Amino acid sequence: CIRDRRIAAPLVERAQVDRPGATYRFTVLDDPAQVNAFAVPGGFLYVYSGLIIAAEDEAELAGVLAHEIGHIVGRHSANQLASQFGIQLLSAIALGEEASEYAVDIAQIAAQLSSARFSRDDERQADRYGLRYVVESGYDSTGLVRFFEKLSALEGGKRTSVETLFSSHPATEERIRDIEVMIERSGVAT
């Protein structure tokens, strides 16, 4: 969508300062029911049409795009992939040459599950990058907060303390508070 590229262009320009030479390729996935976006190694960013529909204004969409750009700048997907490969290699060594394919499959699934999401630190770093890119691009700094508030409403409540303890993702409410603190400290609330 041309509008989405226009919104992303200044964010990508700001990200070049932190990761010169990186390329960013945006693809919209047609699924109005999915309110999600993700980044993968190589600068590929995927945004579901449901997220674009859910974003009420450019600042909300810019906030999400900037956050995903932050994952690429932080090399979070690449680091996750390297970690996953390392776990699979160690599993293969530990299982030995005599291991059945079934055992190898289990090891591979376990490796994928162990790194299925970005870490809490990765998410916070992507939020920091994203907030900076949004502000430097002239978008409302509270756009990402507003979008996370929508996600929180969609989630329909908070996680239990056990879910929070074992989650690699900070809770949406926690992320909202963290971003509000970042905005307050930066003095850029718009």
Language-model features: where?
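A Zn2+-metalloprotease active-site environment signal
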Residues: 3-190
